């Protein structure tokens, strides 16, 4: 299943990428590919990341997204994730 996650949060992109690095092994168990794009918000202190991933283990992915560490990070950074299911066309 291909997904797009739009994450909007208070903090720097580096903080987000550091958090993702903490989940590196778990992500490898849940996704065959994952890519990140940075969106310029033009707002000091606010960041937006677009993540595209091919999820191969939905249960594992859900476990990552709802883990205590992830929830703690989300709360600390006032993060909002909007998740879309996407279909590859070509």
At which residue positions do the language-model features occur?
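Regulatory input/activation interfaces that engage signals or partners
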Residues: 76
């Amino acid at each position: 299943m291909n997904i797009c996650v739009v994450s909007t949060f208070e903090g720097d992109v580096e903080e987000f990428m550091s958090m993702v690095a903490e989940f590196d092994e778990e992500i490898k168990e849940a996704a065959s590919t994952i890519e990140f794009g940075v969106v310029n918000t033009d707002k000091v202190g606010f960041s937006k990341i677009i993540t595209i991933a091919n999820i191969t283990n939905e249960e594992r992915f859900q476990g990552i997204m709802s883990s205590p560490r992830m929830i703690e990070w989300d709360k600390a950074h006032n993060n909002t994730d909007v998740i879309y299911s996407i279909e590859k066309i070509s």
